[in-house]
């Protein structure tokens, strides 16, 4: 009997193993009505009828299962018919994203559609769009594809239509942002619930020991014989097995409680994304949680195209964790690496030092060196890594060594330059080494009395084939040399022809090298003739030239150069150039050959020297400081295109440093190529150790024909080893490592390729991975086993043993000394306290001062306070207020020494006359500024209101021993003065800007990777691109400086006790030097002052200048000012006019859309509530999904929610908790660590409500109350001017805070401005950053216009360069507000008009340098009325 359709469906459900995962009604009543099979296309389409819709999660489970089951037979598809579609509307919305993904729409369109609101109307699905443009676009591109996708899932939908959503036309930006915020909060709440659920499940599993999975194993075992390289996967396949290492993991929970797992793996041939849905009632998730980045897995599954990312992925059916034996160093006796580059070798090294140290330790190496290019910035991390791994760290650097000056004249002779005879010559050779290559052409001209009097030109036969490179360079062919004489004959004839003339050559060291080598081989000995190098001569007498090549000089001197790189032509050109140079020397007072070097030498001679690489290894602690001095001088004093180390500098600070010969660009290696053995050994004696590196690292020299062949390379090794033996200097084999493993080479290639001018781009990069001992021994096998062991193992270990343990970073804080600081801080505190509170101080004041002074003085922090006090006093004396940041306002001593305006005592009254005071220390008042006005009961004077109720512990910790971090906000325009004042206080050599290190960011790395792949014509999957991006990320790219950090070195030490110094980004014109180390590395060793720049003090200063009002006299509780935080009424405008329910546009801290929405939700009326708003807006998970919900639900009001970190400690102490417990709770919550059981118990014992505990558990970061109070104080002062002195406010705002202006709109009437703002609100989601910045300005302009004020056009006669100025009830904008007009041009316009009015647009262009585009803009603005294009010439001007 044939099976029914329902029975068929049950069999299918059992076969694909979903019977226990779907609703039983579905299993019982579902029907498999038909299977359409196409043998030709190998496809099966299942026609299935279901009683009702599957949940979206169950739909994914079912379709994934059916695909997996039959994947080896056919490509599966399906079509559902749903019997009960009554709840179709609900399911359509949930399926919408899935259906979008199963269309051929672009990823961008898919992403846009997913954000849209849906409405089901009968059998029509309406997608609500933001505007008509968007509607038309979707109509065009979707083209019925969505209907098809929905019908496949069983939906009875006839069509999908796109309509403009009226509800999305928000009246103003605030409501738009409110809508977005509401959606974000919903998502955030859902995410939080999921996270808490995961945490709870994880904790439960741990408690019950339910999960013992320590190794991932899902599905069937995978046969190793089936493994394919990932690079071979280029199309969809039914069943593929791969192996790879994980470099990224993503677990995403679905609403059903299941997860989708995404792994990114690589086998270093390519990378691939692996995906799998976890199964219900299985421990799949536990297995996947056992995986981590760096583990190897073997996986099997179907390769299919992910339609969302348009890339191949594997849908896994089976996966197992496998063990891969890591690379090992199996040698019994290990080597020591002495030449290694980390990510601090700018755009060259790949891993950080920790990765190298970890590897060396695993291999059993006892020591490892770090030798980055020109810097020592890896030292701090190297120290930590070495201590952690128990390995000896050897600190070093690969630097650029230069001679202090390169001679212009060699072998000086007493010859008058005018009367001398010169032989100007040039050689063409088979290569660059005078030791291994030969002369093939020798040409010369003889010069006397400024005239060429004779010529010499000969070829010589090298008896070898010329390389293609030499033929192309010299234009000499083998045929031209076949019958040429021997070089011995040519040189003998040449020597006789030259006589005692002075040799002249361009880059004479090269040409003379070949002449001297040839002479010596003939037994003549080196030449005794004097020499002049025209290259070095030009560099000295033509310092204004950036180039000194023969082509360039010929052009500059007006000399014809007919065929460059043929000896005779080069020689004649050089001769004519030299004749003119002799005249230049005469004008400089140089007339004799022996005087050239002395009279033409200068302090910049080091710039002319060719740098050679040198390795500097720190041997002793003294050597570390000396290296810091060398590094500093090279970066500050001797920087020219690259940091340079003059030999004299190295000699001066060589104590405690071992000097090595470095790589193939070192002095010794070059000498072996260019000098005889005696000279090589003479040079070798300068060094403490000689380096040789694996032949593979020199392969590029052979590829570039700098070395003839491998045999020649082996000869070079022999000569180097011989030099070591004859001088007794140890020879060590070093690896010159730039990355850990061979497969990391691609990352270095990408970084090098991103630098077009890098010479390493000229050839194939050598293999520069971190080699094991056996790898190094194998590299040097050609030397024989004994010699290889000597240089690889024996000598490196002996050298390491000669090096002492060195500590590069101090282990304590060294603060500056200021005589009498303790006494002065105490005296200042009490003097100012008595000025405020009277001679008979209240006990609460005394107790607080003594408590704080005990900590400050007892822990040596007085000098830090005193420095800050001096800086603030200087700024105040110069007329600029200073705002405090961070928690310094928690210190009453800081208040009394005038470091901060925030008073942390409990709210209180003070009588300015009789000094009567009244404190409210029961928590009933949030801020003293909120106390009602009151007269003194004793003398009737109006009482001062003060106190923000902030505990001291939030600044220096519960024990008062935390180093104070005093951050100060100076006016941005005054900040440079404050910085420079530290030089007055401590001396110029004791203060430095805090240095930073900029590394390659992920986005930048992505650009490098894409650029490299495009240039190479390579296509890679997204997963492989992600891997390459990770490899490039984090490499040092540049250096910089902290925006306000100043490092202060104590007078009893110098900067080199802590760090080298440099200029930021090596900018030698910078006014400040910075620490070479990133300031975080020495944060605990030296004092850092945070002297930051901020707009608020600048704006306050401008408002004071305009109004004459002292900002300190502004009433903080002014009712009209306070009203703007809940309504625009006190501004004289309505919500409808300014499109906002508050009046805080442009008020610092309260002007953003996010905070304005908070104001609308909370309607604050007091200073303490504004402080709460500030704290809530700066915290993480403090407002959204937390305090906002509590306020909305009516559980508590704004004043009682947790806003700032200090609130927690104060609240809990008032509740009855011990101060220490209250402090610990505050610290735990503010750092996002939640609450411990001990804290929860203490809170419950003191009846702290549950909502308070729940709120604490959600918080990730909290803002300090002192910081919030300081910000709010500035904001209220500025708001006061906005309410009571509007034009002063608007002029100041536009001058100080605004940067992007739409003047064309700003000069219009108020309704036009308002309509422009409304239009931008309607397009807000499509606006770019610049447009949003313009919108912010137009919001304020709209408000200004509705208050009855107007913006004039730019005025050629009245506009200033930078400041908006007031004229009547209008503002006149400055020139800088014109889009595209820079600061220099703005200044130039003002300067030009002082010489008289502009007569025409042409005159404006000529005098002020305005472009035609800007002139047209000014014309459109109405700023050039009656100004003609050109000036008319009057008869009276004739």
From Swiss-Prot:
Keywords: Cytoplasm, DNA replication, DNA-directed DNA polymerase, Exonuclease, Hydrolase, Nuclease, Nucleotidyltransferase, Transferase. Coiled coil: none annotated. Its main location: cytoplasm. One of its GO terms (cellular component) is cytoplasm. It is found in: Cytoplasm. The keyword Plastid does not apply. It catalyses: DNA(n) + a 2'-deoxyribonucleoside 5'-triphosphate = DNA(n+1) + diphosphate. Residues 422-578 form the Exonuclease domain. Its EC number is 2.7.7.7. One of its GO terms (biological process) is DNA-templated DNA replication. GO terms for molecular function: 3'-5' exonuclease activity; DNA binding; DNA-directed DNA polymerase activity. The keyword Cytoplasm applies. NCBIfam families: dnaq, polC_Gram_pos, PRK00448.1. Belongs to the DNA polymerase type-C family. PolC subfamily. Required for replicative DNA synthesis. This DNA polymerase also exhibits 3' to 5' exonuclease activity. This is DNA polymerase III PolC-type.
